[in-house]
């Protein structure tokens, strides 16, 4: 049996999911947390049972060694030879990587060179890649980029109205993120609608602590709300989303903060947390709003307002919409936010059933049968998309 492992390496974590391919059955999944810190945590699910250990794991290489040993110890695999493919999530591929690629030394250098565009993520992603290559050097390794799916955006979508030389010299442009998720749900929507994705105009709403909207026409990303960084677009858990750029020097002058400190506020202290003053967790805000907390209610209203702006804009851009997709933590689980987003979209042919909306984390159509625009909840599955890309590249080598 051939097995593919999907990896998401963070600076102090390593998430993994092992698939039997090509059946796409999940064999096991888990996470290594607090790598390089005291009391690291290793969690793995075997036969439905979650097993948790606290153990010191000084670096990613040790984490990979331990992960592979645990797969053997728990009889998930008989030997390392059963693993025939490894897929690595990489946050930023820039313009260099419009699709997933086989990893060789040059690809690693290119990903490292792109680290200035994603300083928090790409170095960690590379650390994970190197750790696996050292221990399983002969296994096909594939890099799957968050930005790749959005590389089909036309220049009018991705260029900023800045001196063109900034784009040529520094690569300043919109890149977009959550691409693997947007791609997965758009393909799944086509399956559920029984139509080729090439015929469809889709609005995909990836709503989690980080959130982005995408306009997908003919199976290709035409525009997306995040920009040069994941800070742009809609209001999020702790991120501001779009603001007037002149606010940055204004805030610096008023507060005495440096540009870096202001950026930190925009990334970590803004969004729903900033407006509410309570929490970045939507569940907390829904609870507080239900108790009559005006600021919690306002934070939710701002979130929905920004989503509406993109839905209207992208519907106009594609000259109509065939389906609106909700995915990720909030999109899949919050009937409250879905209701707020869908109310007022009747003008564009969205007719949805409030009774069908009372669901969490379940794949489901929410629209009435006569609705010209379909509304679907599709739980995202980025790990499966990674495993599929590994399988494709492995089979084409």
UniProtKB/Swiss-Prot annotation:
Specify where it is mainly localized.
cytoplasm
| Annotated site residues (Transition state stabilizer) in this chain | 178, 239
Q: Which residues bind ATP?
A: 15, 206-210, 281-283, 329-333
Subcellular location per UniProt equals: Cytoplasm
EC number(s): the record gives 2.7.2.1
Which chemical reaction does it catalyze? Answer: acetate + ATP = acetyl phosphate + ADP
What NCBIfam families would the database entry show?
ackA
Query: What's the record's note on cofactor binding?
Result: Mg(2+). Can also accept Mn(2+).
The protein's matches in InterPro entries, at most eight in alphabetical order, are given as: Ac/propionate_kinase, Aliphatic_acid_kin_short-chain, Aliphatic_acid_kinase_CS, ATPase_NBD
> Binding of substrate: at which residues?
89
Q: Which CDD domains match?
A: ASKHA_NBD_AcK_PK
Q: Which metal ions or organic cofactors does this protein require, according to UniProt?
A: Mg(2+); Mn(2+)
Catalytic residues (UniProt) = 146
Record carries keyword Transmembrane helix: no
Q: Know the name of this protein?
A: Acetate kinase 1
For this protein's source organism, the top of the classification is: Bacteria, Bacillati, Bacillota, Bacilli, Bacillales
List UniProt keywords, sorted A-Z.
ATP-binding, Cytoplasm, Kinase, Magnesium, Metal-binding, Nucleotide-binding, Transferase
Species whose genome carries this gene: Listeria monocytogenes serovar 1/2a (strain ATCC BAA-679 / EGD-e)
Pathway annotation from the record:
Metabolic intermediate biosynthesis; acetyl-CoA biosynthesis; acetyl-CoA from acetate: step 1/2
Residue positions annotated to bind Mg(2+) are: 8, 382
Gene Ontology process terms (BP): acetate metabolic process; acetyl-CoA biosynthetic process
């Amino acid at each position: 049996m051939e097995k593919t492992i999907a990896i998401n390496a963070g600076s102090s974590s390593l998430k993994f999911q092992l698939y039997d391919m090509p059946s796409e059955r999940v064999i096991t999944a888990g996470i290594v947390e607090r790598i390089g810190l005291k009391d690291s945590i290793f969690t793995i699910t075997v036969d439905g049972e979650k097993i948790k250990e606290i153990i010191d794991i000084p670096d990613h290489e040790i984490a990979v060694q331990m992960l592979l040993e645990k797969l053997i110890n728990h009889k998930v695999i008989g030997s390392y030879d059963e693993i025939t493919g490894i897929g690595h999530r990489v946050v930023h591929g820039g313009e260099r990587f419009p699709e997933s690629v086989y990893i060789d030394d040059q690809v690693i250098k290119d990903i490292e060179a792109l680290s200035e565009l994603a300083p928090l993520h790409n170095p960690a992603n590379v650390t994970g890649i190197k750790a696996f290559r050292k221990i399983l050097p002969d296994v096909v390794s594939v890099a799957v980029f968050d930005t790749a799916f959005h590389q089909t955006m036309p220049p009018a979508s991705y260029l900023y109205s800045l001196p063109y030389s900034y784009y040529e010299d520094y690569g300043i442009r919109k890149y977009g993120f959550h691409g693997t998720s947007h791609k997965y749900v758009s393909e799944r929507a086509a399956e559920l609608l029984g139509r080729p994705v090439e015929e469809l105009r889709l609005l995909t709403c990836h709503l989690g602590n980080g959130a982005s909207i995408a306009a997908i026409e003919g199976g290709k990303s035409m525009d997306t709300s995040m920009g040069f960084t994941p800070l742009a677009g809609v209001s999020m858990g702790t991120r501001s989303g779009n603001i007037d750029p002149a606010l940055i020097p204004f805030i610096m002058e008023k507060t005495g903060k440096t540009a870096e400190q202001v950026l930190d506020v925009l990334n970590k202290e803004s969004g729903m947390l900033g407006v509410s003053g309570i929490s970045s967790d939507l569940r907390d805000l829904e609870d507080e709003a239900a108790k009559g907390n005006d600021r919690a209610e306002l934070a939710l209203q701002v979130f929905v307002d920004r989503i509406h702006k993109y839905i209207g804009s992208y519907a106009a851009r594609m000259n109509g919409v065939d389906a609106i997709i909700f995915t990720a933590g909030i999109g899949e689980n919050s009937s409250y936010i879905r209701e707020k987003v869908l109310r007022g979209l009747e003008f564009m042919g969205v007719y949805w059933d409030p009774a069908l909306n009372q669901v969490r984390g379940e794949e489901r159509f929410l629209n009435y049968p006569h609705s010209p625009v379909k509304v679907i909840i599709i739980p995202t599955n980025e790990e499966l998309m990674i495993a599929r890309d590994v399988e494709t590249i492995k089979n084409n080598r």
